[in-house]
Regions:
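Sec-dependent N-terminal signal peptides
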Residues: 4-13
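Extracellular/lumenal and peripheral-membrane lipid-interaction modules
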Residues: 16-186
Length: 186
């Protein structure tokens, strides 16, 4: 019984910490979107805030077929990991999938997506550097299919390997191992 109580208390503390990190991340995002972030300031999103956002908010974006999502960061690089069932994700969007393709993408698999970010002067370029499914790198036509079928339907205006203008008065975005810094224009 004591173990159960200790486990329940530990889970409550972890969920409370996650909720606090999520609330902090959402407040920072709100200040960017509403234009209340101080000019010249740097809004810093800790890795804990980013992963808390992913844990709580991704299910609202992708309601089925994804779990255990997490982000790791490096200098100007980032990787997202999740267990994904690509067929469930397609079905959740109401998309039909032909029999052959459904057999290829059915079932939960570990997926890692890695990016490199260049940012400055109010612009950004996000390069897709690697996509791995079950430890196998996706390349060429397979990678194109994955981007067109699963990523672009969620983010139809996304630019991959193309320069785009940052909104919300953002000057640049800096990825670092501890988190992401968002510099606001002066």
């Amino acid at each position: 019984m004591h173990r159960f109580v200790a486990l329940a208390l530990l889970c409550t503390q972890v969920l409370t910490a996650g909720d606090a990190a999520l609330r902090s991340a959402l407040a920072k995002l709100d200040s960017l979107e509403n234009g209340t972030a101080k000019r010249g300031s740097i809004i810093f999103f800790s890795l804990q805030e980013i992963n808390s956002w992913a844990l709580y908010m991704v299910p609202g974006i992708v309601p089925q077929g994804i779990r255990n999502q997490r982000v790791t960061l490096g200098t100007d690089t980032g990787s997202g990991y999740a267990l994904m069932d690509l067929l469930k994700m397609r079905h959740a969007e109401g998309k039909a999938t032909n029999w052959m393709m459904s057999r290829l993408i059915e079932g939960e698999r570990p997926v890692t997506v890695s990016i490199h970010v260049q940012s400055g002067d109010g612009h950004c370029i996000v390069d897709l550097t690697r996509v791995e499914i079950s430890g196998v790198a996706a390349k060429g036509a397979v990678l194109d299919f994955l981007v067109k079928t699963f990523f672009l339907p969620l983010y139809p205006t996304a630019k991959i390997s193309e320069r785009f203008e940052l909104s919300y008065n953002i000057e640049r975005i800096d990825l670092r191992p501890a988190g992401i810094g968002v510099k606001i224009k002066k």
